[in-house]
Amino acid sequence: DDGEPSTSADTNGIFELPNDPQDIISFGGSDNSSGVDLTNLSLSYKASSSTSRVVSALTSLDYANTGSTDINTLLNLDSSIDIYSDNPVTGVNSSSAANKYYEANAQIFVLAYALQAFVNETNTSSNNTKTFFESLYTSIQQNFDSGVINLSEFIETSSFIDGYIDSVLSANNISLSSSASDDISSSVSSDLKSIVKSVVEKISVRNDSTATSAITNYATGTFLNDVIALANGTADAVRIASYSSNLNSLIASDQNIDES
């Protein structure tokens, strides 16, 4: 807004702002590893006195948090992890807690941004990610309140992903029908749920850092293009089916790494 401090991040995502507690909202940008332009990406950060501030998918999820349960508890992250100051990328392989933090942050990003891409392509709209983090938080909180334990694992399941996607499609007036016309067919909805689940559960820290990066780069690059293709009706059916049968091959071919 006018009169508020603003800045731009450098190519490494580093930024400087006045050292006083304030909410931080970022718009746009690209993924530094994959080079993908992240159209209408919006990330958020609640006001904090921390001198080192990390704006991420998890701080954006917490920005939507209106309850009394913190994100670490909701997603079973170790209490030593400070999502507001610990960089989820640079800490990879320093500890099992740091690896889980990286995985959860990447998964939350994919769940929010993939649905943003699908909805915006389907509705010819330009919603930013804030709305989708809010929907995702609501789904997570509802499952937590219903007694689901170990939500960091549960967000990888069909039960969670299907319910979350259904709620997003409904909130954006995208209904199911037997034809593609103005709505989407039930088969497209099923395909979307399937490929999102396949990618979310694939995201993890591997012993080989090249494999870890390849999975994440694929998830923030080619996978998003496939989501958009599903939305506009140009997706290749064989390729979409491969997400369930042979995702490793898709990633290896796209990222030029060994499939094993």
Predicted region positions:
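Feature for extracytoplasmic/surface-facing segments of secreted or surface-associated proteins
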Residues: 1-260
